From Swiss-Prot:
This is Adenine deaminase. The keyword Hydrolase applies. NCBIfam families: ade (TIGR01178), PRK10027.1 (NF007457). SUPFAM superfamilies: Composite domain of metallo-dependent hydrolases (SSF51338), Metallo-dependent hydrolases (SSF51556). It catalyses: adenine + H2O + H(+) = hypoxanthine + NH4(+). One of its GO terms (molecular function) is adenine deaminase activity. CDD domains: AdeC.
Length: 588
């Protein structure tokens, strides 16, 4: 196997270094001098008083010794507290339904200066072309958009139909790209544990970079084996003791708070002064409505401080420095001489009230980002084109026959969690013995002409109507849930007509729908417009019953076989604990 080039080492040219040194010595003029500022010390705790001198994209010096230093431009921080730019340790930008350009516009003014992104959603739909587009966006972004090379396309071989493959040869072509930091989440953890050569080949090929994990609920010898293969982190932990054990075994813990998977309350009590360098924050999947109304990583920091009494320097440490160290991004994560000048000025550090953001040494203006968004998106050459190769359906496509007295498996939803339970329900002439059981179906959309895979869903809260979407992890086939076959067909046909998207049907009519023209995953609308459309969708969905907080994101994970316990793919009902297909009828 070829040896990887470690692009995590950040190089400063000799000329840049000399210019920085001259300013640090007090012999040259800085580009910017941030005055009337207090720096939060993430290493020792406490604060550092004094200005921040900036040359180009780097910090030349900090502290009172730079009072009145010569500079081309002074920035009066008005007593603000300066912290390093926030870093999201693991996310799929596609889950925001925004393009990378729009995502930057929405999150950079909130202090999110760096993201570690796995674009496996779009790669599952269109293969290497999707990864190439994300790389183009990363190259032109002001935000530091780093990429982990998608490792499991599809998530689990032989379990679902997806739109494309992403071979090891294709992956290796991107390994040495300057925006690539490693190998994305290795979801086939049973294959890694059993030593499948195809998976070990991928781990070996990226061994000099960061190897992301994915092992919800794993423990014992299996967890030891998974870590022994070289896996370095996990963002799927949902239990306190699970997270503690992973830390004990040398794993880094990504504490996730997304729109559907909400694990911060369970895992935040683990964070302390000792282990905080091994703890990071991530969102994984967060929708535009929450970003607009609650925030992104800034919202997670706020909750650590206000709800879990995490000390300020520790909360901001896990939001920046810990992640930068883990991914070898040693030029990021601290406000210190020689580091990149990614700086967030806070008028209130406890409430994470962002006053101003600088990235790569330049102040960010939200209005400028918005004004340039359309042109920058066009420059990135998005991969437009209809990816829905599916003919319209009819109610008869969702017909299921049930025998009175028989017991049938039900996917039981846990609100605000990605895991499900595998339950069962007995059918009688009056229906099922549980009032909350509705229907679910997954339809492949890549031209294979498979019949819909149908099943039963409980606990979702759908009392009437139907919801359909082409966002369904990770293969992104069409998923639909409903109380009647007629309304399910209506919802599916609307997203087919839209070329992909989300839809709510109630009372036999489409109540709200959102087209997603890029891969059936992303909109080209502005962040504000998208948030408003999501608001309308959620309002329409709430009329269908007491659904999860984020019904479409929760629904999107009902077809992901690598998260237990029971899921439905385009090929049938899948037992995520036995890693095998099972039957709708309970026969044993």
């Amino acid at each position: 196997m070829d040896q990887a080039i470690n692009h995590k080492i950040h190089y400063i040219s000799r000329q840049q270094r000399q210019e920085i040194l001259a300013i640090a010595r007090g012999e040259a003029v800085a580009d910017y001098l941030i005055e009337n500022v207090v720096i939060l010390d993430l290493i020792n705790g406490g604060e550092i008083a004094g200005p921040i001198a900036i040359k180009g994209r780097y910090i030349a010096g900090i502290g009172s010794e730079y009072n009145d230093a010569p500079t081309l431009q002074r920035i009066d921080a008005h007593g603000a507290i300066a912290v390093p730019g926030f870093i999201d340790a693991h996310l799929h930008i596609e889950s925001s339904m925004m393009t990378p350009v729009t995502f930057e516009t929405a999150t950079l003014p909130r202090g999110l200066t760096t993201v570690i992104c796995d674009p496996h959603e779009i790669v599952n739909v269109m293969g290497e072309a999707g990864f190439a587009w994300f790389a183009r966006c990363a190259e032109q972004a002001r935000q530091n958009q780093y990429l982990q090379v998608s490792s499991c396309v599809p998530a689990l071989e032989g379990c679902d139909v997806n739109g494309a493959s992403f071979t090891l040869e294709q992956m290796l072509a991107w390994r040495d790209h300057p925006q690539v930091t490693g190998l994305a989440e290795m979801m086939d953890y049973p294959g890694v544990i059993s030593g499948q050569n195809a998976l070990l080949d991928k781990l070996d090929a990226f061994r000099h970079l960061t190897l992301d994990g994915h092992c919800p609920g794993l423990g014992g010898k299996e967890l030891n084996a998974y870590i022994a293969a070289g896996i370095e982190n996990c963002h799927e932990s949902y239990l306190l003791e699970e997270g503690r054990r992973k830390l004990q075994l040398g794993m880094s813990l990504m504490i996730r708070e997304g729109s559907a998977a909400r694990n911060l309350n369970a895992l935040a009590p683990l964070i302390n002064e000792f282990n905080s360098p091994q703890c990071m924050l991530c969102t994984d999947d967060r929708n535009p409505w929450e970003i607009a109304h609650e925030g992104h990583i800034d919202a997670l920091i706020r909750r650590l401080i206000e709800q879990h009494n995490v000390p300020l320097h520790v909360a901001y440490r896990v939001a920046s420095w810990s992640t930068a160290r883990h991914f070898g991004l040693n030029h990021l994560g601290l406000l210190a001489p020689g580091k990149q000048a990614d700086i967030v000025l806070l008028s209130d550090a406890r409430k994470v009230t962002v006053q101003q953001v600088l990235v790569k040494g330049e102040p960010i203006d939200a209005q400028t980002l918005q004004a340039e968004e359309s042109a920058r998106l066009a420059q990135s050459a998005p991969p437009y084109g209809n990816t829905i190769a599916r003919q319209p359906v009819s109610a008869s496509d969702f017909a299921l026959q049930f025998t009175p007295g028989k017991r049938y498996r039900v996917i039981d939803v846990i609100h605000n969690e990605l895991i499900t339970h595998s339950r069962s329900s007995v059918y009688s002439e009056n229906g099922f013995d549980r009032d909350d059981v509705c229907f679910i179906a997954v339809l492949e959309r890549y031209g294979q002409r498979l019949d819909p895979a149908c099943g039963l869903l409980g606990g979702f809260g759908l009392n009437e109507g139907a919801l359909a979407a082409t966002v369904s992890h990770d293969s992104h086939n069409i998923v639909v849930i409903g109380r009647s076959a007629e309304e399910m067909a209506l919802a599916v046909n609307q997203v087919i007509q839209d070329g992909g998207g989300l839809c709510v049907v109630r009372n036999g009519q489409v109540q709200s729908h959102l087209p997603l023209p890029i891969a059936g995953l992303m909109s080209t609308d502005t962040a504000q417009s998208l948030a408003e459309q999501i608001d309308a969708l959620k309002a329409a969905a709430r009329e269908c019953g007491p659904l999860p907080d984020e019904p479409f994101i929760q629904m999107a994970f009902l077809s992901l076989p690598v998260i237990p316990a029971l899921k439905l793919t385009s090929q049938g009902l899948f037992d995520g604990e036995k890693f095998a297909f099972t039957t709708l009828e309970v026969t044993e």
